[in-house]
Amino acid sequence: MTKVLGITGGIATGKSTVVALFKKAGYPIVDGDIIAREIVAKGQPALAAIVETFGPEIVLTTGELDRKKLGQLIFASPQKRELLNETLKPFLRKEILRQIEEAKKKAALVIVDIPLLYEAHYEAIMDQVAVVYVPEKIQKERLMARNQLTEEEAQQRIASQWPIEMKKERADIVFDNQGTREETEQQVKKWLEEQIGKK
């Protein structure tokens, strides 16, 4: 029986590091960010839905999405960001579910990488949810260093997601990423040994 493990975290908590460790161990990854980009490619139904919602000026002359223009629109307006999310939600969910079913045919464990897993209510389709955790103070420091942000800018980005402590409380598994990469890798290996029987 294939297990479906959803992996989430907060911005700059190290989710990508943990997902990469599962990938290295040979497990298929269903990547929510990649799917979100693919579903709005030229000619896709989700792009047509965006045009219907935001108008034809959101598309370049090539027929592709003008990501810069869309980014400016949704960054300036939380209402427009919410509208975009609502527009894309059914297309995204359908493709994520399709890819999970495909991956389940090939492996004993499928990893589903969704940054806003709890916010978008994907936990119901997972067997378990793992949260990659660091305290908010470290999260903010890492985000400021990684993206060259001021403290205020970093705080704004963190505040746009559920608090990491809240995600930690709801998680079935917590991968603590405060230490070294090696320490995090040991946690992943231990979980794989216990759950999948793979060393």
From Swiss-Prot:
Broad class of where this protein is predominantly found: cytoplasm
Gene3D superfamilies: P-loop containing nucleotide triphosphate hydrolases
One annotated Gene Ontology cellular component of this protein: cytoplasm
Binding site residues for ATP: A12, T13, G14, K15, S16, T17
Pathway linked to the protein: Cofactor biosynthesis; coenzyme A biosynthesis; CoA from (R)-pantothenate: step 5/5
Location(s) in or outside the cell: Cytoplasm
SUPFAM superfamilies documented for this protein: P-loop containing nucleoside triphosphate hydrolases
Top EC class of this enzyme: transferase
Membership in a protein family: Belongs to the CoaE family.
PANTHER family registered for this protein in UniProt: BIFUNCTIONAL COENZYME A SYNTHASE-RELATED, DEPHOSPHO-COA KINASE-RELATED
UniProt-listed HAMAP family: Dephospho_CoA_kinase (MF_00376)
Protein name: Dephospho-CoA kinase
Species of provenance: Enterococcus faecalis (strain ATCC 700802 / V583)
